[in-house]
Amino acid sequence: MNRQLSGENATFMDRLKAAVNSFGLPRLIIAGFLLLLFIAAPFVGADFATQITNTLNRFSWNAILVLAMVPMIHSGCGLNFGLPLGIISGLLGATLSIEFGFTGAMSFVMAIVIATPFALILGAGYGWLLNKIKGGEMMIATYVGFSSVSFMCMMWLLLPYKKPEMVWGFSGSGLRTTISLEGFYDRVLADILSIDLNRFGINLVIPTGSLIFFAILAFLMWAFLHTKTGTAMTAVGSNPSFAKAAGVSIDKMRLISVVLSTWLGAVGILVYEQGFGFIQIYTAPLKMAFPAVAAILIGGASVNKASIANVIIGTFLYQGLVTMTPTVINSLIHLDISEIIRIIVSNGMIVYALTRKMGGKK
């Protein structure tokens, strides 16, 4: 009897150990800490429902930007530190949509339509460059992202925008640093089928439309990765020699992945803006790749393997911690240092994520 019990205990422990290894001990610790913050929130005076709302909002804003990492990881191009190229495409689509006089939901649709050719052109050039420097993609991508943002800092002042809602009032030219989306596509997705419990005295609002939009894109990405092209792309990333021997064009697959990633970055920033309520330009896109990279790595991805589950888990853990940690600690010590704590936590998680080499077992 004792031998049978010890055997069952050993089996249970083996299963538990396998589950921990599969999920990843670091992610388990991060998830446990996030759960602890949610539990502690009501005891330090932070409204629990409000914190859930904030976390879901930040998840819906950032999830597509994290999803943009998946194609390039699958093709072996590594982490997309050149995400600002896609973001710039989205910003061009957003500002031109407003400049052309579109309002409401149509301004969001037209922003995507206008951003698409920019994303395709910039993505193709970016992909061509990465094909020339195989092995150093992530370093070059970082410089591409930084230099493109710096170049656009000049162009935002020089491009002939005339819409009064966007240009500087004293000169009538040059775009403002921050542009309000009120009257345009502010919360155009978030308010679709949104669940608002404020009428019942609960400060919980679920941005259903934004979550559904992300779910659709995530499903399309999953479906694409299971097509012939998607399978060839994954083969290029996992074993280039085998893919080449099978007749797959490595450069073509890598180019497709970069273009797709750039387009997702453009759509992702538009979704971010509609939830946030503002367009921010000039240096705003400079470091937006780093939280997205950190999120997908924390979710369990590696530099050559990623899944939709990694995107969802990583985005929720990263944005949950960035949202909850400052709120709980602020309420606990009664000092307004939320921004300092947010910077420490977000950059600390980025450093941790970038030091990881493998997926779940690390």
Language-model features: locations:
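Single transmembrane alpha-helix segments in multi-pass membrane proteins
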Residues: 50-100, 120, 124-135, 296-305, ...
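Central hydrophobic cores of alpha-helical transmembrane segments
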Residues: 86-90, 141-147, 308-321
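Hydrophobic core segments of alpha-helical transmembrane domains in multi-pass membrane transport
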Residues: 29-41, 69, 146-153, 210-222, ...
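Transmembrane helix-bundle core of multi-pass membrane transporters
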Residues: 148-225, 334-338
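Transmembrane alpha-helical segments in multi-pass inner-membrane proteins
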Residues: 259-343
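Helix-loop-helix "hairpin" substructures at the membrane interface of multi-pass membrane proteins
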Residues: 201-280
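Alpha-helical transmembrane segments within multi-pass membrane transporters and channels
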Residues: 103-149, 318
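Cytosolic-side transmembrane-helix boundaries in multi-pass membrane proteins
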Residues: 1-37, 238-245, 249-252, 314, ...
